[in-house]
From Swiss-Prot:
The lineage of its organism: Eukaryota, Metazoa, Chordata, Craniata, Vertebrata. The gene is Hhatl. It is found in: Endoplasmic reticulum membrane. One of its GO terms (cellular component) is endoplasmic reticulum. The keyword Oxidoreductase does not apply. This is Protein-cysteine N-palmitoyltransferase HHAT-like protein. Keywords: Endoplasmic reticulum, Membrane, Transmembrane, Transmembrane helix.
Amino acid sequence: MGIKTALPAAELGLYSLVLSGALAYAGRGLLEASQDGAHRKAFRESVRPGWEYLGRKMDVADFEWVMWFTNFRNVIVFALSGHVLFAKLCTMVAPQLRSWMYAVYGVLAVVGTMGPWYLLLLLGHCMVLYVASLLGQRWLCLALGLASLASFKVDPGISWQSGFVTGTFDLQDVLFHGGSSFTVLRCTSFALESCAHPDRRYSLADLLKYNFYLPFFFFGPIMTFDRFHAQVSQEPVRPEGELWHIQAQAGLSAAAIVAVDVFFHFFYILTIPSDLKFASRLPDSALAGLAYSNLVYDWVKAAVLFGVVNTVARLDHLDPPQPPKCITALYVFGETHFDRGINDWLCKYVYDHIGGDHSTVIPELAASVATFVVTTLWLGPCDIVYLWSVLNCFGLNFELWVQKLAERGPLAQIEARLSEQMSRRVRALCGAVNFWAIIMYNLVSLNSLEFTELVARRLILTGFPQTTLAVLFVTYCGVQLVKERERSLALEEEQRQDREKLE
């Protein structure tokens, strides 16, 4: 019943045909809806003039995307280009000092952007966690880290500390929350690693060099301290062919930015959900496509942002966390995350520490609850985040409960009688149901509870059985294609390992 079970080529071809046709049909419905709603009064704030020579308006509902790649694009490019230039000069002249150069440039960038008082505020938090690390008590470091994080997420702490920022500008809140929150996680990682390795005697300078690395400072991704320290301490030697991969990644990120810009001139996927009266008139296929595309866009946004940052980090001879796994390939709650760096941090210091190998029910429940408590604090406590955390925590545990149930009793006997191909089909069907649970649970936080209720009601209640079964079958086809991709990768990895053994 393993991952290497193959299906007939004709069957996979049918799945590809069905999935392609369904996506094209849903896309056409969204395109028509976007054209019909372009001049609605409710769309005026978030659908602005775009390609006037083609008569196309543009969806600008995502404040962060507009800020990053329109208003503040030149500032971001200038700051990162300066970092790359000085890093290259330092690597050529004094490679042993490059980590200091990273820190000095990062500190200057933070002071120039947010002001000296904001820098002093962050240094205060760094000092608190550094002193805690000297005591060698893991629980104390984690408790102080969470308390420090809470001070940036709830009042009165957040109101008081936001006053340390000098000046006002459009991206100020985003930079404040990003820089502060990531600083706390990095300092907590430093403290926990110091407790885990008391023989290594990390210094305050190591913490500052780690925290003020500019490409990761405001938006992440976060690297745990042990990985960053090990990589930045190595001699900067670039493997053969790596520069080509860096250029390819940079080109891919640029192409994705252009593709999103083009997409938003034709599909108003972020604006339509805000007008429930208009969204409720969409055909079922277009509504399902709208829900799916909202999650895909969030993944693309994360992949582009981390792709740009990771390109700079790779030029600095670092191996940063990879972009998140595409939502299209997710049919298991255990693999669902939109920030691989945060996911790695949570797994290392909370989830795996409590849950062990995640094979027993009670430790897994305790580990997942603790993980989502920290995640709730990271995202900022509010009703929507509470609901999102409860739903995803339930989904993660429900998978284990179903797995345990399937391993014993009648279900295990039934599966044992099935062929490997039929077992794969049954599991793909379960994966299709899980896929839509993942979409619904995350749509709550990415969009709104009201829009999620509309989608659920249309796809499950009023659309039953035709729409429900049609969407489920299309999703089943997609899951089978994802499984086939996973099978191919597993075979390639096995062949690579066999070649290494022969060599």
